[in-house]
């Protein structure tokens, strides 16, 4: 298939494995630019020019899991651990709202200390502020998810990382792809807006694996999809591996937009870490969400999923004004509401 034929098939929504694999495999600048343009047009048509701002508070870097790629893994003895108090978390959320955030994202390692009741109490307090609450806390029993939904949580982000069960087990030895999927299906069933997403460039990952990720996202019609490159952390077993490729990751974002026209897709912080201006580029290739770091100092320097993370040493109230300026410079506008998924596209 020629590049033109692939683009025509994508426009006709002929999402065969062959088409997606060819789209990811072609290493041609002209094709890539046409793919990004198509994704941007679909983004504009179905989710518009608003960029939704989700202020993320990383409230604990304690984690019971031992994922091979993650700097928060429990065997990383070089990381100074922290836990924010519930009062600190709520006050930080209040400040984000004052700065204009319409969604608060609470993210942590899998830290049993807060589970489930402390999280419920925090969610209830933040919901009084009139904003959406997204949780990104990992894999927990169904009853925890139920409690948090009853407390008022609106969304849950649980990236599947890779849909290859063998690779998943190798990289995440404490758990399995099956368990991850069961959690995602439970979250959907409970009425959460549910987010998945993958890492690009994982050691041992193939183009076929990336195609499986895209087909998995399409099959389950996720409301949110976060995609970012693998970035090796020096205090993990994958320290010496190669980082994920920016352009290939960008193509995954673009194809996700084409597959899921009205889902919310962030320009992830990792994209801005491996390439200067990477988030802005991603917002021009299908993304419509940005997640400014709202973790207060000194904690923000310690939430080390990967090294070199941007926006860590800036003033800890700089990020929301910064992304608002970024959105303006792109000719877009900040979202005016909670930015939930609006189903305007009928999936075929």
From Swiss-Prot:
Alphabetical list of PROSITE patterns matching this protein: RADICAL_SAM
Keyword 4Fe-4S found: yes
Root EC class: oxidoreductase
Pfam family, any one: Radical_SAM
Binding annotation for [2Fe-2S] cluster: 311, 319, 322
Keywords carried by this UniProt record: 2Fe-2S, 4Fe-4S, Iron, Iron-sulfur, Metal-binding, Oxidoreductase, S-adenosyl-L-methionine
SMART domains per the UniProt record, alphabetical: BATS, Elp3
Comment on bound cofactor: Binds 1 [4Fe-4S] cluster. The cluster is coordinated with 3 cysteines and an exchangeable S-adenosyl-L-methionine. Binds 1 [2Fe-2S] cluster.
GO BP of this protein: sulfur compound biosynthetic process; water-soluble vitamin biosynthetic process
E.C. numbers: 1.8.-.-
CDD domains: Radical_SAM
Ranges where the Radical SAM core domain occurs: 49-268
Protein origin, superkingdom: Bacteria
Residues given in the record as [4Fe-4S] cluster binding sites: 63, 67, 70
Gene3D superfamilies: Aldolase class I (3.20.20.70)
Matches recorded under SUPFAM superfamilies: Radical SAM enzymes
Entry's Gene Ontology molecular function annotations: 2 iron, 2 sulfur cluster binding; 4 iron, 4 sulfur cluster binding; metal ion binding; oxidoreductase activity; transferase activity
Function: Required for the maturation of the [FeFe]-hydrogenase HydA. Catalyzes the reductive cleavage of S-adenosyl-L-methionine (in vitro), suggesting it may contribute to the biosynthesis of an essential sulfur-containing ligand that binds to the hydrogenase active site [2Fe-2S] cluster.
Family label: Belongs to the radical SAM superfamily. HydE family.
Protein name in UniProt: [FeFe] hydrogenase maturase subunit HydE
Lineage: Bacteria, Thermotogati, Thermotogota, Thermotogae, Thermotogales
């Amino acid at each position: 298939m020629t590049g033109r034929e692939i683009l025509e098939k994508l426009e006709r929504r002929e999402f065969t494995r062959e088409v997606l694999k060819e789209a990811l495999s072609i290493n041609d600048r002209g094709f890539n630019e046409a793919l990004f343009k198509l994704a941007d047009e679909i983004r504009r048509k179905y989710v518009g020019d608003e960029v939704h701002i989700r202020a993320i508070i990383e409230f604990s870097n304690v984690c019971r899991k031992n994922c091979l790629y993650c700097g928060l893994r429990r065997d990383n003895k070089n990381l100074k651990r922290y836990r924010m108090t519930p009062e600190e978390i709520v006050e930080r959320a209040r400040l984000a709202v004052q700065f204009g955030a319409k969604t608060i994202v609470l993210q942590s390692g899998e830290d049993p200390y807060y589970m489930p009741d402390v999280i419920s109490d925090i969610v209830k307090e933040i919901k009084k502020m009139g904003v959406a609450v997204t949780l990104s806390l990992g894999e927990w029993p169904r009853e925890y998810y139920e409690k948090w939904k009853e407390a008022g949580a609106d969304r849950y982000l649980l990236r599947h990382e890779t849909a290859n069960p063998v690779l998943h087990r190798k990289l995440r030895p404490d758990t399995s792809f099956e368990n991850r999927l069961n959690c995602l299906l439970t979250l959907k069933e409970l009425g959460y807006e549910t987010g998945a997403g993958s890492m690009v460039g994982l050691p041992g990952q193939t183009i076929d694996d990336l195609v499986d990720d895209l087909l998995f996202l399409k099959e389950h019609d996720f409301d949110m999809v976060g995609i970012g490159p693998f970035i090796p952390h020096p205090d993990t077993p994958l320290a010496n591996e190669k980082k994920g490729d920016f352009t290939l990751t960008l193509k995954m974002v673009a194809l996700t937009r084409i597959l899921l026209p009205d889902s919310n897709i962030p320009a992830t912080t990792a994209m801005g870490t491996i390439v200067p201006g990477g988030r802005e580029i991603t917002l021009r290739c299908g993304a419509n969400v940005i997640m400014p770091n709202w973790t207060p100092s000194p904690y923000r320097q310690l939430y080390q999923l990967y090294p070199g993370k941007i926006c860590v040493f800036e003033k800890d109230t700089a990020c929301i004004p910064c992304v608002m300026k970024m959105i303006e410079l792109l000719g877009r506008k900040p979202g005016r509401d909670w930015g939930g998924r609006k189903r305007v596209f009928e999936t075929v």
